[in-house]
């Protein structure tokens, strides 16, 4: 435990928070040097900006493929990915609000909607995963988003009650006073997520794997999310027991989630869909050329 404490005290890791971190340095000064630290904020902002820029760069081609494929669920998922990416970009750029006096309410609202949006994408993908294959009908869209909407609606309601009803600082980390009840709630939250990903991981390695899509990308996605949520669960449990190393470790998992989850989701789900569209177009072109007699000479 002494080694863990020394790691948490290291000047090269994410800075700890205090209630008045930006009281003397202002918004910019707090963002650069005090609220979480320069490295923490820079990684978040750069990763989110690069991903939004990539989405914008690919937007014309992606919209063209979506309109040709006419997959309702993919169109809706792509649109929601854009919305959540912009929310996450705002969240990453406004980190100083977390430790700026007077910004607690707006920070809680921004974090609540950003994390709920990202969780909606997670739950939607898991719900869609259990359908076995890509579906393009309105029924599949309704079923997937109905499940996700119910789960996220309940999650958002409970968090709002704890935030604004009981005054539990769910989204404001304070190293000077560890709120054990808050971290107990996060332990339950992370335990549920880790349990779901663990169940799917087990299914992929059991006789029930035929019920899931036979796609290596999905298996890798589940493995990464299981590891991330397992590590986050461990960090929350440590923090709930008063270990400052747990707070530092939780900060690392939070950075990884907000910086890299949306790109991981895109690579796993949408990029694969767009690649399939390219292959489908190549097959169509080949069939048309074959029907036109372009390959007759090869058989002579």
Swiss-Prot record:
Q: Per the record, GO CC terms?
A: plasma membrane
Chief location bin: membrane
Quaternary state and interactors: Interacts with GPA1.
GO MF terms here are: melatonin binding; melatonin receptor activity
Q: A Pfam family matched by this chain, by name?
A: Tmemb_40
Q: What is this protein called?
A: Protein CANDIDATE G-PROTEIN COUPLED RECEPTOR 2
Function noted in UniProt: Plays a role in plants and microbes interactions. G-protein coupled melatonin receptor involved in root growth mediated by the bacterial quorum-sensing signals N-acyl-homoserine lactones (AHLs). Binds to melatonin. Phytomelatonin receptor required, in collaboration with GPA1, for melatonin-mediated stomatal closure involving H(2)O(2) and Ca(2+) signals. Essential for melatonin-mediated plant response to osmotic stress probably by activating reactive oxygen species (ROS) scavenging ability.
PANTHER family named among the record's database cross-references? TRANSMEMBRANE PROTEIN ADIPOCYTE-ASSOCIATED 1
Q: Which Gene Ontology BP terms does the record give?
A: G protein-coupled receptor signaling pathway; regulation of stomatal closure; response to mannitol; response to molecule of bacterial origin; response to osmotic stress; response to pheromone; root morphogenesis
Task: Quote the disruption phenotype from the UniProt entry.
Answer: Small leaf size phenotype. Abolished Gram-negative bacteria-mediated promotion of root elongation triggered by the N-acyl-homoserine lactones (AHLs) N-3-oxo-hexanoyl-homoserine lactone (3OC6-HSL) and N-3-oxo-octanoyl-homoserine lactone (3OC8-HSL). Insensitivity to melatonin-induced stomatal closure associated with abolished melatonin-induced H(2)O(2) production and Ca(2+) influx. Reduced osmotic stress tolerance associated with increased reactive oxygen species (ROS) accumulation.
UniProt membrane topology term: Multi-pass membrane protein
Expression across tissues is: Expressed at low levels in seedlings.
Look up the domain of life of the source.
Eukaryota
Keyword vocabulary terms for this entry:
Cell membrane, Developmental protein, G-protein coupled receptor, Membrane, Receptor, Transducer, Transmembrane, Transmembrane helix
Q: Which InterPro entries does the protein's record reference?
A: TPRA1/CAND2/CAND8 (IPR018781)
Family label: Belongs to the UPF0359 family.
The record's induction entry says: Induced by the N-acyl-homoserine lactones (AHLs) N-3-oxo-hexanoyl-homoserine lactone (3OC6-HSL) and N-3-oxo-octanoyl-homoserine lactone (3OC8-HSL). Triggered by melatonin in leaves, cotyledons, hypocotyls, roots and guard cells. Induced by osmotic stress.
Localization, UniProt: Cell membrane
Give the transmembrane ranges. Answer: 37-57, 73-93, 110-130, 152-172, 183-203, 222-242, 245-265
**Organism annotation:** Arabidopsis thaliana
């Amino acid at each position: 435990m002494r080694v863990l404490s020394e790691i948490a005290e290291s000047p090269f890791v994410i800075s700890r928070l205090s209630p008045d971190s930006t009281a003397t340095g202002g918004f910019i000064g707090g963002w650069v040097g005090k609220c979480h630290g320069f490295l923490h904020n820079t990684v978040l902002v750069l990763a989110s900006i690069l991903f939004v820029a990539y989405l914008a760069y690919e937007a014309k081609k992606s919209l063209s493929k979506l309109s040709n494929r006419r997959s309702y669920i993919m169109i809706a998922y792509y649109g929601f990915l854009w919305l959540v990416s912009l929310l996450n970009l705002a969240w990453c750029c406004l980190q100083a609000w977390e430790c700026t006096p007077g910004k607690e309410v707006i920070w809680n609202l921004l974090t609540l909607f950003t994390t709920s949006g990202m969780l909606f994408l997670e739950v939607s993908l898991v719900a869609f995963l259990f359908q076995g294959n890509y579906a393009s009908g309105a029924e599949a869209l309704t079923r997937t988003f109905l499940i996700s909407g119910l789960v996220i609606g309940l999650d958002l309601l409970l968090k709002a009650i704890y935030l604004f009803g009981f005054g539990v600082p769910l989204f404001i980390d304070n190293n000077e006073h560890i709120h054990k009840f808050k971290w107990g709630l996060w332990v339950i939250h992370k335990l549920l997520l880790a349990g779901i990903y663990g169940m799917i991981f087990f299914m992929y390695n059991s006789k029930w794997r035929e019920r899931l899509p036979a796609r290596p990308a999905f298996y890798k996605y589940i493995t990464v999310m299981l590891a991330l949520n397992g590590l986050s669960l461990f960090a929350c449990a440590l923090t709930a027991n008063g270990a400052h190393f747990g707070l530092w470790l939780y900060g690392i998992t939070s950075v990884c989630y907000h910086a890299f989850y949306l790109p991981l989701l895109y690579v796993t789900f949408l990029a694969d869909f767009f690649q399939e569209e390219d292959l489908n177009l190549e097959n169509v072109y080949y069939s048309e050329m074959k029907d036109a007699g372009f390959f007759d000479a090869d058989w002579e």
